């Protein structure tokens, strides 16, 4: 490989890493925005369901949920909050960002408003 080819290859690799980081950051921003939008929708649905009076026609008397009622978005976030993804990717050359799931996603979404 000639010095010119090595230089071009190095520039291409840097460009690819920069594009990957920008794509990753854009995806994180979209994830946080979507989480906030879903939290607002949950709050609207909760308010609406609290104000509506159930009638015997619409309520299923045999319906029973075995899950505890979740009244806040933080409780919803904590319900399924585990990850099997390693914190640092094995063959990555760039620094890994903190994983966003569960309460970490909820806390990030609520502080970025």
Swiss-Prot record:
Sorted keywords for this record are: Gas vesicle, Plasmid
Biased composition of type Low complexity is found at: 11-22, 69-81
Compositional bias, Polar residues, is annotated for: 52-63, 82-93
Question: Which cell locations does it reside in?
Answer: Gas vesicle
State the conditions that upregulate or repress this gene: In PHH4 (a deletion of the p-vac locus) transcribed in all growth phases, maximal expression in mid-stationary phase. An unstable 6kb transcript able to cover gvpD-gvpE-gvpF-gvpG-gvpH-gvpI-gvpJ-gvpK-gvpL-gvpM is detected, as well as smaller transcripts. Gas vesicles appear earlier when grown in static culture, possibly due to O(2)-limitation.
Record GO cellular component, one term: gas vesicle
Q: Where is this region: Disordered?
A: 1-93
**Taxonomically, which superkingdom?**
Archaea
Q: Which family does it belong to?
A: Belongs to the gas vesicle GvpI family.
Assembly and binders: GvpF to GvpM interact with each other in vitro, and may form multi-subunit complex(es). Interacts with GvpC and GvpO.
Q: What does this protein do?
A: Proteins GvpF to GvpM might be involved in nucleating gas vesicle formation. A minor component of the gas vesicle. Gas vesicles are hollow, gas filled proteinaceous nanostructures found in several microbial planktonic microorganisms. They allow positioning of halobacteria at the optimal depth for growth in the poorly aerated, shallow brine pools of their habitat.
**Any remaining note in the record?**
Encoded in a 14-gene locus called c-vac which produces cylindrical gas vesicles only in the stationary growth phase.
Q: What is this protein called?
A: Gas vesicle protein I2
Organism of origin: Halobacterium salinarum (strain ATCC 700922 / JCM 11081 / NRC-1)
Its taxonomic placement starts with: Archaea, Methanobacteriati, Methanobacteriota, Stenosarchaea group, Halobacteria
Q: Which gene encodes it?
A: gvpI2
């Amino acid at each position: 490989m000639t010095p010119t080819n090595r230089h071009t290859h190095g520039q291409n690799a840097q460009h690819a890493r920069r594009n990957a980081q920008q794509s990753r950051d854009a995806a994180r921003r979209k994830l946080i925005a979507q989480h906030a939008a879903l939290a607002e929708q949950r709050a609207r649905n909760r308010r609406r369901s609290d104000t509506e009076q159930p009638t015997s026609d619409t309520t299923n008397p045999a319906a029973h949920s075995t899950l505890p009622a979740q009244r806040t978005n933080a409780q919803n976030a904590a319900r399924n909050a585990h990850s099997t993804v390693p914190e640092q990717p094995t063959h990555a050359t760039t620094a890994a960002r903190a994983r966003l799931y569960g309460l970490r996603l909820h806390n990030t979404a609520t502080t970025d408003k």
